[in-house]
Amino acid sequence: MPFDTRITRMLGIEHPILCGGMTGCGTPELAAAVSNAGGLGVFAIHNAGSPEKGRLEIRRLKSLTKKPFGVNLTILPSMGPPPPYEEYARVIIEEGVKIVETAGSSPKLFLQMFKKASGANTIITIHKCVSVRHALSAERYGVDIISLDGFECAGHPGEEDIGNFVLQARGAQALTKPFVCSGGVSTGTQLAAALALGADGVNCGTRFCATQECNWPDSFKDRMVQGKETDTVLMLRRLNNTCRVFRNNVATQVEEIESEKGPDFDFGDVAHLVNGKRGRAAEQQGDADGGIWSAGQGIGLIHSVPSCQQVMDQMVEEAEHTIKKRLVSLLEPRSRL
């Protein structure tokens, strides 16, 4: 039985399960597979390398699915010339994308662009936030849906270290817009828990990285299946730019350098280890120890590499069973002997 939440109604999807845009693996193929399975797949446009290549990838995504999909625009600080974010945004608008996910820095400027340009064809906006404080700001800016990312998440979990058991409950207290629970979500029991806490659905990243449709090499996926919930590293904490990645040889080196340098730690100390060029080379070579790559604590709940359809079916079935059987049974009176 499909779940009926504010998210499913607003986005026109069957299941309240999103796969947010991700660096490297947020491809049209993965987004289409998630959307075709009844969720919302999101293509990360910056993966294309340029706005015009992004345009072609959006068109290719449209050829792969007739279901709703989203496009991610992540705005991050840059040590060199920043990416052409406004050009990416214009491509998204010109290609008639209906759902946009933003992440990173404040989306205010781009929200204005999307709202102004969409006219009658309203663009639904989702923004990833790592705290209720940031989520409330996003609501004021006019974001339609909040992706509330707990400390368990891959990538950038923020600096406040609030896990989802508290964060989602606070979201339910404070937010008026629909929101999804993001970070560490890999199972249907967690979907049921998120709904119980007040979320309207879940966003899964790491879980969909370990699928057949993800473009990551098998060596990465194998390490995820073998991994435990303790096999991630928080790096760059001293720079207030915390990032959660898989615990491999490179991540361990970064962790050791950061610890040894203490208050004198500087990004230059590890730039040669964490730069994107090295990470991309490791991915292309299938070397799971060659560079850093993101993974959330949910890897401890991943034990196979199924298709996106199988992930979706299993999560929905588990969530329904948890609610109908496990939770309802706790309220049923027991016979007394």
Task: Tell what function each PLM region has.
Residues 22, 184-185:
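Active-site metal-binding loops of divalent metal-dependent hydrolases
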